[in-house]
Swiss-Prot record:
The lineage of its organism: Eukaryota, Metazoa, Ecdysozoa, Arthropoda, Hexapoda. Changing L151R: Coordination of the heme iron center and inhibition of nitrite disproportionation. GO terms for cellular component: extracellular region. This is Nitrophorin-4. Heme binds at H80. It is an enzyme of class 1 (oxidoreductase). Salivary gland (at protein level). It comes from Rhodnius prolixus (Triatomid bug). Its EC number is 1.7.6.1. Disulfide bonds join C23-C143, C62-C192.
Length: 205
């Protein structure tokens, strides 16, 4: 699903090419999910990811996110880096709580300083579910919607350490979701570059 993952990599907005894939209804949020630990303002790195149409997934993909609370609102800032072109992309979302561990993000594309490049567009949003999280790692499911149509499923393993390997607990969460970790694509060989200062500052924009 190249157009789906590429669309995420271009601030989750620009390269949609007509893909339609109903998202799973079986992404279950972690029981006892600790919102305060997950949304503490620190950076999560995407270390491994799985698109359910893997033949078209770009092999070189880097992403990170900061999730926190600003002015009483849950917010998420996403950063994407293309190691081939060295292009960087950012977007910022205010999150609507669907239930504990499940959120809808209405996003806007911004530059690193928070200046809006593409405003929030009705019908274009993503939903994500925190399927597992501890202090240092997480498994999330994301479904991107364009024109209120599902574009398909993307799973990502996150870590607070960009160089960390997935641990047994997060791998167990992958297995519990009836997924195979061996099918996830690692970002570790992608020569990823990150911009944590800008990413964290975008939570206040």
């Amino acid at each position: 699903m190249k157009s789906y993952t590429s669309l995420l990599a271009v601030a989750i907005l620009c390269l949609f090419g007509g893909v339609n894939g109903a998202c799973t209804k079986n992404a279950i949020a972690q029981t006892g999910f600790n919102k305060d630990k997950y949304f503490n303002g620190d950076v999560w790195y995407v270390t491994d990811y799985l698109d359910l149409e893997p033949d078209d997934v770009p092999k070189r993909y880097c992403a990170a996110l900061a999730a926190g609370t600003a002015s009483g609102k849950l917010k998420e800032a996403l950063y994407h880096y293309d190691p081939k072109t060295q292009d960087t992309f950012y977007d910022v979302s205010e999150l609507q709580v669907e239930s504990l561990g499940k959120y809808t993000a209405n996003f806007k594309k911004v530059d690193k300083n928070g200046n809006v490049k593409v405003a929030v567009t009705a019908g274009n949003y993503y939903t994500f579910t925190v399927m597992y999280a501890d202090d240092s790692s997480a498994l999330i499911h994301t479904c991107l919607h364009k024109g209120n149509k599902d574009l398909g499923d993307l799973y990502a393993v996150l870590n607070r350490n960009k160089d960390a390997a997935a641990g047994d607990k997060v791998k167990s969460a992958v297995s519990a979701a009836t997924l195979e970790f061996s099918k996830f694509i690692s970002t570790k060989e992608n020569n990823c570059a990150y911009d944590n200062d800008s990413l964290k500052s975008l939570l206040t924009k």
